[in-house]
Amino acid sequence: MNQLECLKKYTDIVVDSGDLVSINKFKLGDVTTNPSLIRQVMSLQKYQYIIYDSIRYAKKKGGSHKFKLENAIDKVSVILGSEILKNISGKISTEIDSRLSFNTNLCIERAKKLISMYEEHDIHRDRVLIKLAATWESVSAAKELKKENIQSNLTLLFSFAQAKICAEAGVFLISPFVGRIYDWYKSKSLIKSAMIDDDPGVNAVRKIYQYYKEYGYHTIIMGASFRNVDQVLALSGCDRLTISPNLLHKLQLSDDLVIRKLIPPKHKKLQPVCMSKSEFCWFHNEDAMAVEKLSEGIRQFGKDQQELENIINNNF
């Protein structure tokens, strides 16, 4: 049995890709996408029909050019997501414009719009996770969306403070970014050794996992942004792991032993009092890595969104 099959005994595996060919190859339940992946996919000739269909939809809806462009962008995500859902049994994670990350009301509005678009494709909201950057405002939006049976995937999660407010809000799922945490510490020459137990990204997820299970939080932990197979295997037993096609392929090629690394504690503790916004801001602000990587991630996804807008605008 290869490592991927062994890993699936302990952890739900998710494909981190927007490419239908890669997704179909691995036959897994769930898929995650983001603006970077969608921009890459939309640059391929075989997916140009999605852009043209989205523009036709936007023109039919009418309004100003800005409104049409916004509708076309969202429709691209929804058409691609709908195509992916035809080939999987689980959920698709679709991200809203990261430039809305500091406005709770706009996050809610855009999330509802995406869900409405999916429902136009006869996709039930239970099969869609709305991806939001894990800011205070976005977590607040996720808490409100939950009341309307719209579940969220809080992404760009780097700090323990972010993990705490997500758990306290009862969000459906979080995506701590293992590789990007590792990158920051490596760039600062702050990693003690090459041993996986000294990997700060791996240890961040281990800490969150232990805390969530110890205090009985139901939010799903999905490790993301892996740089190598060792990081993946070090988190075997995590609720979910979203993995790129390249690393999934490497796992398939190996028959080495896979040992479960994350095991929930037997005894539960009473949950602490929820943090206030000011407490969260200070707690998060104390983590220089998290502050830098969250800001960088939001900017990068915003840049990818802008580039996708340019592609669509040139086809109007």
UniProtKB/Swiss-Prot annotation:
It comes from the Bacteria. One of its GO terms (biological process) is carbohydrate metabolic process. GO terms for molecular function: transaldolase activity. Belongs to the transaldolase family. Type 1 subfamily. The active site is at K131 (schiff-base intermediate with substrate). This is Transaldolase. Homodimer. It is found in: Cytoplasm. Gene3D superfamilies: Aldolase class I (3.20.20.70). Pfam families: TAL_FSA. It catalyses: D-sedoheptulose 7-phosphate + D-glyceraldehyde 3-phosphate = D-erythrose 4-phosphate + beta-D-fructose 6-phosphate. Pathway: Carbohydrate degradation; pentose phosphate pathway; D-glyceraldehyde 3-phosphate and beta-D-fructose 6-phosphate from D-ribose 5-phosphate and D-xylulose 5-phosphate (non-oxidative stage): step 2/3. It comes from Buchnera aphidicola subsp. Baizongia pistaciae (strain Bp). Transaldolase is important for the balance of metabolites in the pentose-phosphate pathway. Keywords: Cytoplasm, Pentose shunt, Schiff base, Transferase. InterPro entries: Aldolase_TIM, TAL/FSA, Transaldolase_1, Transaldolase_AS. One of its GO terms (cellular component) is cytosol. The lineage of its organism: Bacteria, Pseudomonadati, Pseudomonadota, Gammaproteobacteria, Enterobacterales. Its EC number is 2.2.1.2. PANTHER family: TRANSALDOLASE, TRANSALDOLASE A.
